[in-house]
């Protein structure tokens, strides 16, 4: 049965979910298949943080931070985060950048500026946005909302494999504990808690390959009468 959700001239597909659920990989592949723009909302905060460090802007200088965010040239292409046309995917994972991202995110005007930047990614022919509140807060009118889930054990195994492939040492029991603690924080926070939108499609990827998850999202999109 086809959805009665109205067609939007610039469609958005939102893919939300907890850490290591596979949402980033699935979002990038869906965007590539459809020829859509891609938004990695989690990386956006770190990109703003990285830029503030590089330009010497203090974490408490709210006005300068807001102007910086408004002027940033950010793109997401083929799984890479680019700042001013340069791939900074590894740079934004540095501890100093993560700490700065947490420090600037406490400011209301900074969060407002970042929300505006996220919404500005909605451009023709369409957008695939991945994050935690894309379908509930940022793009509530998305034509398709997907919420990826997976067991904590499956996600810990994936994260362990990713870290090992990158040459990092990791203990899977520690990863599992960290994921469970983060899930609890994300689900219980006052602002934009991690939860599926009321009209989201739930997709458990615990036993699915990446290709199977991507195919399911594309099937749902086609079922809406959208070209895929």
UniProtKB/Swiss-Prot annotation:
Cytoplasm found in the keyword field: yes
Stored InterPro entries: Cytidylate_kin (IPR003136), Cytidylate_kinase_dom (IPR011994), P-loop_NTPase (IPR027417)
UniProt cross-references to SUPFAM superfamilies, sorted A to Z: P-loop containing nucleoside triphosphate hydrolases (SSF52540)
Subcellular location: Cytoplasm
Pfam families, per the entry: Cytidylate_kin
Main location, first listed in the record: cytoplasm
EC number: 2.7.4.25
Residue positions binding ATP: 17-25
Alphabetized UniProt keyword annotations: ATP-binding, Cytoplasm, Kinase, Nucleotide-binding, Transferase
Gene Ontology molecular function terms on file: ATP binding; CMP kinase activity; dCMP kinase activity
GO BP term, pick one: pyrimidine nucleotide metabolic process
Catalysed reaction, written as an equation: CMP + ATP = CDP + ADP; dCMP + ATP = dCDP + ADP
GO cellular component: cytosol
NCBIfam families according to UniProt: cmk
UniProt similarity note: Belongs to the cytidylate kinase family. Type 1 subfamily.
Protein name in UniProt: Cytidylate kinase
Taxon lineage: Bacteria, Pseudomonadati, Pseudomonadota, Betaproteobacteria, Burkholderiales
Gene that this polypeptide is encoded by: cmk
